[in-house]
Amino acid sequence: MSNIINAIIEIVKAPKHKLKEYSTSHNRANQMGAALEDYIKDIFAGTVGECDIKVRNRKINEVFAYLGNQNNPPDSMLKDGGAAIEVKKIESPNSALALNSSYPKAKLFSGSTMISAACRDCEKWTERDMIYAVGVLNGDNLCSMAMVYGEDYCADKETYERIRGAIKTGVGQIQGIEFAETNELGRVNRVDPLGITYLRVRGMCIFLGR
């Protein structure tokens, strides 16, 4: 099973600083967020220098149980109950780190309403370590990268869920508005006279830069 030590060793063995060139050499889209996610997958799978796309895909599938989607955390999960990985890019070391509607996680739990069915069912699991992999990008240049376990940086889930629950309950008690069931903080139906517009109420969790 791959782990964060394997990833660090791979970075030392084969550092890559130009993500655009790296992504292009692997015949993949060079959008920088996607390129950083690809690089993170490769350092865990040991495929940084692998140019044969079939070999690369095979090795990645041997290491990862889940490879993510655009709408739900995490970005990937290692096999055999290994860590879940969330990849984030920032533009300077002191930038705030936006987690969007997903609150910080010390651990990832299979019962979370934020994850997809594919993530939940990829293998039998209850909870996983959470790794935040944060790359500092200047254009397509990867200036630095940090990987931190969620349990070393985040509070337990009850802390965030208590606040989220209080806000969600408060929003839902507003009178004269038609609410619908949602996993977000709220959803308001029939915002306009025609009843064809709805409003999503979402949180934005942010780690403050230092």
Residues covered by each model-derived region:
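Nucleic-acid endonuclease domains
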Residues: 1-73, 78, 83, 89-210
